[in-house]
UniProtKB/Swiss-Prot annotation:
It comes from Bacillus thuringiensis (strain Al Hakam). InterPro entries: UPF0358, UPF0358_sf. It comes from the Bacteria. The lineage of its organism: Bacteria, Bacillati, Bacillota, Bacilli, Bacillales. This is UPF0358 protein BALH_3577. It holds the Pfam family DUF1507. Belongs to the UPF0358 family.
């Protein structure tokens, strides 16, 4: 029974983290669709805050043993790649 509970908590933790990552990804996608200026202080503040918050959530879940460190790194890495693509797309638009 205890291992079933742990497994359930692990699944819930991963689902919650993925939901938070999806929210950030949607924000990035909206910016990509409109190619609004990523250097906008408000935009940067929101994304930085969201990314920092998610990184803390991931760290907490890893430390509790709810997700593997590799899962957390992969989740954050995907978002960082999307952010890089947004910045690159905006830079290309400016040229």
């Amino acid at each position: 029974m205890a291992s079933e509970t742990v497994s359930n908590h692990q699944e819930k933790a991963l689902a919650l983290l993925q939901a938070d990552a999806e929210k950030i990804l949607r924000l990035i996608k909206v910016q990509m669709d409109h190619l609004t200026m990523p250097q906008c202080p408000l935009y940067e503040e929101v994304l930085d805050t969201q990314m920092f918050g998610l990184s803390r959530e991931v760290d907490f879940a890893v430390r509790l043993g709810l997700i593997a460190e590799e899962q957390g790194k992969a989740m954050l890495g995907e978002l960082e790649r999307e952010l890089s693509a947004l910045h690159e797309a905006f830079t290309n638009k400016q040229q």
